Regions:
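Active-site activation/catalytic loop segments of kinase-like enzymes and analogous catalytic loops
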Residues: 149-180, 196-212
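Short conserved catalytic/interaction loops centered on acidic-Pro-aromatic/His motifs
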Residues: 55-63, 187
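Active-site acidic catalytic loop and adjacent metal/ATP-binding pocket
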Residues: 101-150
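A glycine-centered beta->alpha junction motif in the catalytic cores
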Residues: 18-30, 78-87, 198-214
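Active-site catalytic-loop/activation-segment of kinase and kinase-like phosphoryl-transfer enzymes
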Residues: 17, 63-109
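ATP/Mg2+ or Mg2+-diphosphate-binding catalytic cores
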Residues: 200-238
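All-alpha amphipathic helical-bundle segments outside canonical DNA-binding/catalytic cores
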Residues: 37, 183-193
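ATP-binding pocket architecture of kinase catalytic cores
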Residues: 1-58
């Protein structure tokens, strides 16, 4: 029963393997106060995951991809280039180019110390977390690799613009029950929220035929632009 053949309506066949069945529903189905409350739990879970990375035996070689500026914005960026997203105007490209430059600069200053950069999930959005009301379980580790710990927050909130401050505060409250962040770390939270949204534009472009890309439209872009404008207004390029 753990090996199944899945046939899609168009005749495409997938051979699927199952390790175990997880009962519950995706956190992404929760709304309002229930979602904010669950965000505290997700913050705790994320911190526990990061502590596993921080305390791991570095003598054990772990070959996983890196999620850094080269992977996000480089010539061979993993998901392609945000500039190729079809809905962008020239004004949008100018805005996000400024954001990219500032993100690169600030990440260079932030650095990759062991308490800031290590093994992360790298795709911890709410439909990759299954909850039965008491127990939360994380799935889909194919993107797991080396990256900035706070990038996992950006992944969790990549599709949310409403109640973003409340969700971020709830995540931080849960996270710091397990692992304290420095003031320098906390100042970087808006950067990682914006970073993931910009990188997702590249994914939407390179996966334009996917169901997800077809359902994401102007609202996502507008919310990303608002975050970008706020980020630039509150920071400056040296």
């Amino acid at each position: 029963r753990f090996l199944q053949k899945l046939v899609l309506p168009d005749g495409t066949v997938f051979n699927c393997s199952v390790i175990s069945f997880l009962y519950g529903k995706a956190v992404g189905e929760l709304k309002g106060e229930r979602l904010i409350a669950k965000m505290r739990d997700i913050g705790e879970m994320t911190a526990k995951l990061h502590l596993q990375s921080i305390n791991r035996d570095n003598s054990v070689r772990l070959e996983r991809p890196h999620w850094d500026c080269e992977s996000f914005f480089g010539e061979n960026a993993v998901w392609g280039h945000w500039q190729d997203y079809s809905l962008l105007t020239e004004s949008d490209r100018m805005l996000f180019s400024k954001c990219e430059a500032l993100i690169k600069q600030k990440l260079a200053h932030y650095g990759k110390a062991r308490d800031r950069y290590g093994i992360i999930h790298a795709d911890m959005h709410f439909f990759n977390i299954i909850t039965d009301g008491e127990k939360d379980q994380l799935i889909d580790f194919d993107d797991c690799g080396w990256g900035y710990y706070l990038y996992d927050l950006g992944c969790s909130l990549v599709t949310y613009s409403a109640a973003l401050p409340e969700l971020t505060a709830a995540w931080l409250e849960g996270y710091e029950k397990i692992r304290k962040l420095s003031d320098g770390d906390k100042k970087m939270l808006p950067l990682f929220l914006l970073l993931r949204r910009i990188v997702r534009l590249a994914w939407l472009s390179s996966h334009a035929d996917s169901d997800t890309a077809k359902t994401v439209g102007a609202d996502y872009l507008e919310a990303t632009k608002e975050l970008g404008e706020k980020f630039l207004a509150e920071n400056k390029v040296d």
